Amino acid sequence: MIQSEFSNIQIISHTIRKDPAMTAKILQLVNSSFFGLRQRVTNVGDAVKLLGRALIHSIALSANLFRQLEHQHPQLNRLWEHSYEVACLARQIVLMQQQSKDMADAAFTAGLLHDTGKLVLSTRLPEKYTQILETTEANNQSEWQAEKQMLGFNHADIGGHLLKLWGLPDHVVAAVVFHHEPTMSMENEFSLLTAVHVANYLVDKLHHPTHVNRLDRGYIEQLALTDALSTWESYSKKPTAA
C-alpha cells in the first residue's frame, strides 16, 4: 500500500515536471502564505506529498484550463488569482466549521473552478461577453445577472455543466452552479456551496469594496450562520488568508 502510494506520487511528480508552467504554478501555490510552511518547497515531489493528490489534481486541471483561455479577454487576466483566493478561503471556512479534510479539499476544488464558465463565455461568445461586461459597468449590475438577462443562463450554469461532463462529484457541481444563488439549491445545512458562496463574496469585498457580489443573507440566516459569517470575514482580512 505504502509502495503503491509512493509510486503514484512519483508518477504525478514526473508528469508535472514535464510542464514548466505547471511546475511553477504548483510551487507558487504550495509556498503561498495560505499553507503557512516554515521552509520553502522547491521540489515538485515534496509539493505533491504536502498538498495531496486531490488538491494537485484540482490545481492542474484549472491551471491548464486558465492558461489556454484566460488571455482571450482582458477582463479575465486576474481570474486565476481570484479563483485561487476563493478556493483557499472556502477550504478554510470548511475547516473552521470542524468538517473533514476531504470536504475541505472538495471546497478548494469548487472554489478554484467556480468561475470556469466565464472562460467558456469569453471564448465561445466573445462579442456577446464584451457586451455583458459593458452592461455590467454601465448599470452597476452583477455580471451573472447581466448574463442571465442577455443569454438566459449565466457562467455558473455553464461551469456546472462543464464540471458534470468532466465527472466531478455532484456536491462540487452544485457548489459551482448555485454559488451566486444558494437559496435555489434547496440545501438546508452547511455545505461546499455555503463555503464557496461566502468565500466569493468576501474575496470580492476585499478587492472591490464598492462593487461586490451580493451575499444571500437570508440563506446565511436560514442556516443559523450569522455569527460564523463574522468569524469568516475576520479571518479573510488576515494577511495569511490567501
Located regions from the model:
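Terminal helices and disordered tails flanking the catalytic cores of nucleotide-processing hydrolases
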Residues: Y219-A242
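Conserved alpha-helical "signature site"
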Residues: M1-T116, V120-Q131, T136-E137, E143-N213
